[in-house]
Every structure is written in C-alpha cells, then in structure tokens.
Amino acid sequence: MKNIVRFLFVSFLFISCQQKIKPEDISKINGYWEIEKVVFDQGEDKEYGINESYDYFQIENNNKGFRKKVMPQLDGTFIVNDTYETATVRFKDDKTFIDYSTPYAKWSEELIAVSDKELVLKNAEKKEYHYKKAESINILGDGKKTK
C-alpha cells in the first residue's frame, strides 16, 4: 500500500511539474539550438559535447515555419544549404506538437518544454531531445559582432 501511495505521489509531482505550453511561448522556439543530450525510453542518456551542426527554427505568428540544419563556423557565420523541413505547431488535448514535413516524409514531435534557454522535444520513439540555446562562435577575436 505504501508503494502505491508513493508511486501516485511521485506521478502527481511529475505530471504537475510538466510545463504547459501556451501560444505565446511558441516564439521562444525561434533561433539556433544545440543538442545537449538524448534521453531514451529506457532511461539511459546520451550526452553530446561539441556539435558540428545546430537546428535553426523559424516559426511565424501563424504557427508555421521551418527547421533546418546549420553548421557554425569559427568566424561567427553559419554554413546553410537549401534543405529544410516545414514545421507547423499544433495544440491538441493540452499537449503541443511540431508537425514536420518534407517531400519524402511527415512526422511529429511533442514539445515538452521551451524557454529562452531550453527546448525539449519528444519523438514517436519516446526519445527526448534536450537542446540549449546556441549562439554563433567567433574565436578569431576580430571583435566583430556576428548576426
């Protein structure tokens, strides 16, 4: 009986602490995001150190936009290509999803948390992708501001 009560209490805490995403939070997705770790369904984590690519999101006021991979350069710029995924934010049953599509595939990820510094997405395989807000890299020390 004690174990059941503990389980219910912990479950309640977990559910009540989960962030409720509001429409005004969606603009926080915009920008460059660097993956920090992936949490697998079985509970194991894969930590990421330095990443060769970032995810760049641009979501407009109509909840539509895109995601693309960019590669940061040492001078503060990014290498980009023409490949991208269209992205649409969808609210359903107190959950928030980002629906992606390319000419070849369609899929969704649940938006678990978003803030100015953190983004957490969960895919259909129940893998949680934890991102941190990324900035351009400028180690050349030329003093120039990067965009």
PLM region descriptions:
Residues Q19-E34:
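N-terminal helix-cap/turn-to-beta initiation motif at the start of protein domains
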Residues I29, F57-G65, F91-K95, I112-L119, ...:
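Short, solvent-exposed coil/turn segments at beta-strand boundaries
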Residues E109-Y129:
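Short, compact, well-ordered microdomains
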Residues K122-K147:
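Edge beta-strand at a domain terminus
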Residues K2-V10:
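Sec-dependent signal peptide recognition
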Residues L13-S16:
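C-terminal motif of bacterial Sec signal peptides marking the signal peptidase cleavage site
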Residues I79-I112:
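An anionic, turn-rich surface loop/hairpin at beta-sheet edges
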Residues K46-V89:
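N-terminal glycine/threonine-rich, aromatic-flanked beta-hairpin/loop signature
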